[in-house]
Amino acid sequence: MPKISPQEWFKSPLGQYLLTLEYDYINPVVMDTFGFYAIQMGNFDINFLDQSRIQNKFSLNSNHPDLMTSNEALPFDEASVDLLIAPHILEQMIEPYELLKEIHRVLMPEGRLIITGFNPVSLWGIKRLLSFDIDYPWNTKFISLSKIKEWLPIVGLEMVEGKMGCYVPPIQQESWLRKIHTMEKLGDRWWPMLGGFYFLVIQKRVHGMNAIQPLWKKKLIKTPVYSAQRSRTFRLKP
């Protein structure tokens, strides 16, 4: 059995290095997204929604969850979520395509989905192929960018922005990570498709709909939920 869980790995020097890079990519999109409801999925100490201007923000399956749910069935009404962040979620799923379909269901028309995932065509992907390590992330599926791009139009989603990051080799020595950090600029210029992770901004497209003035749903959650950080509860209409 794996000795290191995803939660533990993302607290390691390499995991923190990766999350810091991803935060820098994700934050500008978060700050530029408006609406009523924003969701972050995943077990991370980092809050990707901390700079969001959206009032109602929730985390799923995190160390301090606002909502407890299975990733396969999101507890939200159809077309009710404006922004959903799913960092390194698809690669942990048995059926990642089904999760994309579920995300499409809950997103508003023109709603945004942010995905990050490990790139198999990278130094990280090479280590995964050559490693017998049973710990995260080397025991997960590295889904290729081409496969993601193949799935998106099938489920009604469209990629509007994409970028690679983390060109350093996957080492855990913090001192070495600081020394070779310059590889990020070099990689972005000379081998941009070989980063350790990809960052994608995706939108839900609904043909024939005018998304300028969508009909916002006032209520979101199917059952009342208590949050230690909030005193408000929300309930879906029956």
Label each region the model flagged:
Residues 24, 28-74:
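Class I SAM-dependent methyltransferase SAM/SAH-binding core
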Residues 72-84:
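A short acidic, Gly/Pro-enriched loop at the edge of an enzyme's catalytic core
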Residues 82-97:
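A short SAM/SAH-binding and catalytic strip from SAM-dependent methyltransferases
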Residues 112-142:
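Conserved class I S-adenosyl-L-methionine
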